[in-house]
Regions:
Chain A
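A structural signal for short loop-to-beta-strand junctions that line the ligand-binding cleft
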Residues: 83-84, 91-92, 120-154, 287-290, ...
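Periplasmic solute-binding protein
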Residues: 104-109, 127-163, 188-210, 293-301, ...
Length: 404, 323
């Protein structure tokens, strides 16, 4: 008897997932209601979740639509998008991290904005480049971020050091600011795309290029990082620090300077550290700092429902309207993507001055290599790890890393 | 095969035994046993559906993916061109293949050895009853209860070179700080240490259960003949524990081969690829580089290695039954 009951339960349990998978299809994706837009993004943490919701609500009210929003953790977004594209349940409006746009556009899952009447004028070149695949623009970003050099004002004043502008000054300042368990500088050289992203401002500023990594310009940038660690001005824990860890080190007073982005500002303002930021230092005084462009792009997936796609395109245009750009930039410490807004923005938010300047010259990671960028990024972070650990000399690190 | 899937089959076998007898009785009366066959089949159906759905399909799909060019495009277009063994060639020819095999072997052997020795020592220790022994034994399960992602984040801060508590302790007693997670020569050791910590509860629990099954009379009889302490352990405990030991070791190997989250959380395969294992390669190819075909090839190699150990386990088990 006992066995029989056990089996009945088992049989029931075996049927449940089948039944469940049968009904899950209809609940997500482009919904049937013509006035409801489904939205998928990765702002699942506060305060971003609420701040973005405000922008979305504004646009929903403007267009007279209701929205059905889903936010997933950042690292799950691409998997979610792939799953949904295979089950043909892509949302009406999709947010993507800008280096992923071309990869997803290449699958054929996105609808080019030229199909709709969308105003794409006045945006910074970098972000248009990031969202363009084979000559077609696939999305717009209301606000972007980049990298800069944060410094601890008190520590630099105490040591009588001005914020560094060149690599030589950076090395000297970092060495002078290293004392006991306080390091001069912190950055992220972790074995993920984050490590590659942090390296780009140094590599690009020095004239290096991801299409050919085996050049003296790229090697000089790597040498700078290796020197900082070898001199003891940076901990060799940089090999395992994410950018959030770098911010924690800086906030704890264990690093006098750090390479990081403006999205850390809310967290820094909660500490009693007095900080300021400058553009990433250059190798030679005549160079212009070139940093990578970060931030998310809103796109219109191919859902098959033409009317809704048109509405979604209007929605994407609205998210990137001037008012929304300024509102989102102010609340989330980003930089508006319409270059004409820069002056007005810096007046309101003087602490964002260096980042706004940095964004004007910033490049997108996928501008040159498109969907092949992840491969180059992997080579970059592997080369950094090989060189800093001493497993390969700087001049061989990139060729060794590119062998896989 | 895991215990969870074996049970229903066994249950089904035991259940069909009486109905076979009933069927035999019916044959004597007439040839109306089709209904009985249906009933028999019904008992197998749930287990069969379960196995086909949750074991058969993924395995077949994975084999298929490994001979296809399966990328992000495939998800939208559904097209995955057949490429034969190209993915396997990519895997074997990649510079990280042999290092990741070696790392997988070192990681597995190191983890199992550490987990088993410490687990057995603790199990023997807790066999004696002493105040709070029940409470302490329950506390030992803690690493098992923590989500792995929490455990690895905590260990990451413990092992931090500059401010980690372990290095604070080491420098406090006059030793040098160790760059646990940032030096390619010690990172694998650090990851193994953490995995040992996570695996101890499993080993203690199963081995403790095995120890409980050894009758006390054996020890009493042994002590009359002068077998106490180490002698009792070698000549009474070890031989009687052998079947349990084989279960612990084989399951341990299979669980350890596929460890992913701990390594991802601690080092993400770094520094300088020092902690790349087959499981990490498979994950990174599939979910970082979106080369699902190559990732599937890596995981198939991993499955074959696991399978070898599963076969060893099944054979060892059969021998035990034969004896």
């Amino acid at each position: 008897m006992r066995h029989r009951r056990y089996l009945t339960v088992l049989a029931a349990a075996a049927v449940v997932p089948i039944a469940l998978s049968g009904c899950s299809g209809g609940s997500s994706g482009s919904s049937g209601d013509p006035d409801t837009l489904t939205i998928l993004d990765y702002y699942n943490n506060e305060p971003d979740k609420t701040l973005v919701q405000e922008a979305l609500d504004t646009c929903a009210a403007d267009l007279g639509v209701t929205i059905d929003r889903e936010s997933v953790p950042g690292k799950d977004l691409i998997q979610k998008v792939l799953q949904r594209s295979s089950s043909k349940t892509l949302p009406d409006v999709l947010m993507l991290d800008n280096p992923d746009v071309q990869e997803i556009a290449a699958t054929g899952g996105l609808s080019p904005l030229s199909n709709y009447d969308v105003d794409t004028e006045g945006f910074a070149d970098g972000i248009i480049e990031a969202a363009t695949y084979e000559g077609e623009l696939f999305g717009l970003a209301p606000a972007v971020n980049t990298l800069g050099l944060f410094y601890n004002v008190d520590l630099l004043e105490e040591a009588g050091i001005d914020p560094p502008e060149t690599w030589a000054e950076l090395k000297d300042a970092a060495a002078a600011l290293t004392d006991g368990d306080q390091y001069g500088i912190a950055f992220s050289a972790i074995a993920t795309y984050e490590g590659a992203w942090q390296f780009l401002p140094f590599m690009w500023t020095n004239g290096g290029d991801e299409t050919d990594l085996d050049t003296p310009e790229v090697q000089e940038a790597l040498q700078l990082w290796v020197d900082l660690v070898d001199d003891g001005s940076a901990s060799n824990s940089v090999l395992n620090w994410s950018q959030a860890d770098v911010k924690d080190q800086f906030a704890a007073g264990k690093a006098a300077m750090m390479v990081n982005g403006p999205w850390q500002i809310p967290a820094l303002n909660e500490t009693d550290i007095s900080w300021d930021s400058v553009q990433v230092p250059v190798n030679e005084a005549a160079q212009t700092p070139v940093a990578p462009l970060g931030g998310e792009v809103w796109t219109v997936p191919e859902t098959g429902d033409k009317d809704k796609q048109a509405k979604a395109a209007e929605f994407v245009e609205c998210i990137s309207s001037d008012d929304n750009q300024l509102a989102l930039s102010e609340s989330r410490y980003l930089v508006p993507t319409r270059t004409a807004l820069a002056e007005e923005f810096v007046e309101k938010m003087p602490e964002m001055a260096s980042f706004t300047e940095q964004v004007a010259n910033a490049r997108s990671r996928t501008g040159q290599l498109g969907e092949d960028w992840p491969e180059a990024a992997t080579v970059i972070y592997n080369a950094i790890q090989l060189a800093i650990t001493g497993k390969a000399p700087v001049d061989e690190a990139f060729s060794q890393a590119s062998e896989g | 095969m895991t215990p969870a899937t074996r049970e229903p089959q066994q249950a089904a076998n035991e259940e069909t035994a009486p109905s076979i007898r009933a069927a035999a009785a019916m044959t004597r009366r007439g040839r109306s046993f089709t209904k009985d066959n249906v009933v028999k089949a019904m008992f197998i159906v749930p287990a069969a559906i379960y196995i086909i759905l949750f074991f058969g399909y993924p395995v077949v799909k994975n084999l298929l993916m490994s001979v296809q060019e399966y990328t992000t495009k495939t998800f939208f277009t559904g097209e995955a061109p057949f490429v034969g063994i190209e993915n396997y060639l990519t895997v074997v020819n990649s510079n990280l293949f042999w290092p990741s095999i070696v790392n997988t072997a070192l990681f597995t052997i190191g983890s199992i050895a550490g987990q088993f020795v410490i687990g057995l020592a603790l199990a023997v220790f807790f066999k004696r009853r002493f105040p709070l022994s029940g409470f302490l034994r329950a506390m030992l399960l803690l690493p098992w209860l923590l989500p792995l992602i929490v455990a690895s984040a905590t260990w990451r801060s413990i092992l931090d070179k500059d401010s980690g508590i372990l290095n604070q302790f080491l420098t406090g007693i006059g030793l040098d700080a160790v760059p646990w997670l940032t030096s390619p020569s010690v990172a694998l050791t650090a990851v193994i240490i953490v995995n040992i910590w996570i695996g101890i509860p499993f080993n203690v629990t199963i081995l403790y259960g095995g120890l409980q099954d050894i009758p006390d009379e054996l020890y009493e009889a042994g002590s009359l003949d002068g077998a106490t302490g180490w002698k009792a352990f070698w000549h009474i405990t070890v031989p009687n524990l052998r079947p349990v030991v084989s279960v612990v070791l084989v399951l341990g190997v299979v669980y350890t081969l596929k460890v992913l989250d701990i390594i991802l959380g601690l080092t993400n395969g770094g520094p300088a690829n020092a902690t790349q294992t087959l499981a990490i390669r498979s994950y990174q190819e599939s979910f970082v580089n979106f080369e699902f075909g190559v990732g599937a090839a890596f995981s198939n190699i991993l499955i074959v290695i696991s399978l070898v150990f599963a076969v060893i386990y099944l054979r060892a088990n059969r021998r035990a039954v034969d004896e």
